[in-house]
């Protein structure tokens, strides 16, 4: 948890404060920022009149005037040099927090009733303190992989207790959303799909990712590395015909089982890239699940139309 009070208003780049708070928070952590539109009266006539009303009110009720006890000219000079005195708050804060990547962003504009003394209320009744709250997205966990929000991971994804190691990229965006699984190399000789997955993993910008994207560049890795075409290296089986697989079966059966049990269940959407094998020439096309529940067929078709 990060708790701050009256920090942002006097910063030349208050947006950087929100960026740094998000950076240092642990995944799932929360920011509580107490602040107020302290010097909006310098640029708004209505707020100026309200500010003067507060000053008269402190005098009438014979309480200490917090502003009179400071160097007003110096403080206003400082306030004119920083951007938040001119911006509408907390609207600016809410928009900036959302843009930065905070989740569940909210503002409690009545918190002053709980935290201010009667004297503080008299002094600042027309510029009440508010409480801004935002949460950092939780990290993404999959087998041997942990990826924090806003991060991109490259390496080997381990399935079946490390027996299977697949080259993969995971992009875990700041903003929450769906999880997309993209695979290639089910047939190890279909190089176009594999190359497409590699290029996609390199070109995707983490700043634009909403949700999580998992890219497995080569599923049938042994056959790919030995240039053994599209069948299993040791069993000669077609991985694309072995799902859901068998944990005690042959090489391709075990791979199919690991993927169907450990990888596919984490995804909301799944795209499997294929192409012509090294001896084939194919016309580009996209097909989608037809023998499935109606809602799956509908969503799959919508995906296929966009691809």
Language-model segments: residues:
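Short "lid" loop at the C-terminus of a central beta-strand within the Rossmann-like core
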Residues: 36-41, 110-112, 221, 276
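A short glycine-rich, Lys/Arg-flanked "PGG" loop and its adjoining helix->strand segment in the class I
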Residues: 15-30
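A conserved beta-strand element that flanks and buttresses the S-adenosyl-L-methionine
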Residues: 3
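Structured catalytic-domain cores with a bias toward divalent-metal coordination
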Residues: 140-307
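Conserved class I S-adenosyl-L-methionine
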Residues: 30-70
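Short alpha-helix
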Residues: 84-108
């Amino acid at each position: 948890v990060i708790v701050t009070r009256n920090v942002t208003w006097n910063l030349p780049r208050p947006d950087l404060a929100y960026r740094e708070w998000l950076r240092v928070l642990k995944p799932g952590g929360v920011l509580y920022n107490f602040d107020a539109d302290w010097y909006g009266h310098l640029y708004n006539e209505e707020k100026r009149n309200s500010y003067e009303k507060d000053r008269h009110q402190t005098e009438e009720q014979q309480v200490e005037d917090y502003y009179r006890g400071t160097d007003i000219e110096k403080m206003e000079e400082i306030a004119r040099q920083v951007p938040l005195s001119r911006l509408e708050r907390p609207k600016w804060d809410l928009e900036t927090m959302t843009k930065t990547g905070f989740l569940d962003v909210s503002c409690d504009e009545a918190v002053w009733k709980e935290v201010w003394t009667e004297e503080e209320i008299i002094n600042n009744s027309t510029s009440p303190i508010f409480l801004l709250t935002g949460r950092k997205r939780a990290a993404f966990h999959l087998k041997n992989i942990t990826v924090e929000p806003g991060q991109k991971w490259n390496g080997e994804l381990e399935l079946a207790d490390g027996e299977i190691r697949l080259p993969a990229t995971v992009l875990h965006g700041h903003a929450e959303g769906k999880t997309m699984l993209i695979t290639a190399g089910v047939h190890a000789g279909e190089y176009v799909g594999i190359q497409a997955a590699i290029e996609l993993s390199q070109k995707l910008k983490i700043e634009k990712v909403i949700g999580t994207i998992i890219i497995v560049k080569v599923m049938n890795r042994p056959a790919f590395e030995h240039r053994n075409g599209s069948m299993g290296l040791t069993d000669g089986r077609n991985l694309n015909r072995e799902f859901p697989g068998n944990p005690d079966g042959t090489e391709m059966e075990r791979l199919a089982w690991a993927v169907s049990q450990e990888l596919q269940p984490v995804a909301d959407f799944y795209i499997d890239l294929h192409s012509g094998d090294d001896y084939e020439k194919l016309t580009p096309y996209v097909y989608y699940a037809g023998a499935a529940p109606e809602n799956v067929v509908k969503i799959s078709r919508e995906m296929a139309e966009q691809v």
